[in-house]
Amino acid sequence: MSIGVQSSGMNISHAELSRLVDAGKSEQGDKAVRDDGRALARADAALAAVVGERVAARRDAVAGSGAQRVELARPKPDAQTRATDRRTVSGLEREHKRLAASQTPRVTGMHDALVQRHVSLDGAKAAHGEGVKRAAGDAPRAAADAPQRFAFADDKAFDAMLALGAAMQKNVQSDLAMQGKLTMLAHDAMMSAAAQDRSIGAAQMTAAIAGGALQATTSLGGAMQQMKSLSTKSMSIEKELKPQAELKQFHAEQALELRGINKPVLSNDEVSHVKIKRDTGETVRHEIDHGGERMSDEHASVLAQEAPARQHRIDMHGMRHEENLVKAGRQQMKGDLLQSGGQIGKNQIDGASAQQQGADRAEQKEDENAQQTAMAAASTRDEAAHRSREAAQKAIDAAKSQVANDNAVAAQVAGNLRT
């Protein structure tokens, strides 16, 4: 295989081209990475020296003959440089995918190295111009002293892609930190909302227990007062109404005796006397006159004297019974008031609990809104980071397309040179 130009008569053999290409190769490992730029520079300088020598010799040979002079265009980056382009872009794409997958900024060193090699466009141009002007003997030393740069350092699109990668590298950590803060805010808001739920439940339980205890206590007190009222009424009936009824009956019987009605007859019942029980409890016996049908005057006088006292006793029993009824009514009222007060107290406890629950629900709503806001902000931040990664991926795709175009142009130039 040979590369040449028919009109100029210049020809470079396959072995010589292989020797020149092999000059740019270096051993594997870290040393290969460090010497990559120097090897490429030496290979370019050697190639330029060989081409310069052949062109100069041929120019001197054809100067006197008057042949037409053919000027060659500046060659495009060689295959080794294009391979370096492809490797660089592939490495960027691989590291970008790893960064997007892990969300961990681990490609800082690679980006820094690339930026250090490509950040100074003027330095690269100056080094290249100086390398062209130097002679063939000084080319290796000049290439060795030149900064380690790739041949495509003049590409502004690639510089823009590197700048985008560096900016993205700086933003990833801040994106992760912000997303972490927003996630923690959402978590704290969720925990606060859960605490408010527990507080509402505790308030409801406390209100239920306190209201139930108060209502039970007041209901029991009211029931006891009602029982006292019933007991007072029962006692009044037993101690007042029954004696009053007996006195009324005896008083009626005595009144009938005074009128001569139901007078005892000895021939029928063989009763010869009448016993009368006084207010003091003393029983007085009166003999019945056997000689006539009416009571004696003494007997009638005694009965007439005791009638007002019996009537007074009957009235007093009635009054005491009325007093007992009033007392029972007061006890009944106390019982009703206790029960009503218990219900009122329970309602107050329920109202206070409802107020506390309302305040807790308001705080819960605020916490839920804060959680939703934090989640929305985190989602927006994640979407922005996703768009940034997509932009970086587009830049990498553009760089790959540019490398492919360079390869196509180089292939076209090589084809033209063969023909």
Swiss-Prot record:
Annotated spans, Disordered: 60-91, 338-402
Lineage: Bacteria, Pseudomonadati, Pseudomonadota, Betaproteobacteria, Burkholderiales
Listed Basic and acidic residues bias regions: 71-91, 380-392
Gene: bipC
Signal peptide bounds: none
InterPro entries in alphabetical order: BipC/SctB
Name of the protein described by the UniProt record: Effector protein BipC
Keywords: Secreted, Virulence
Organism: Burkholderia pseudomallei (strain 668)
Pfam families: IpaC_SipC
Family: Belongs to the SctB/SipC family.
Main location: secreted
Compartment(s) where it occurs, according to its Swiss-Prot or TrEMBL record: Secreted
Keyword Secreted applies: yes
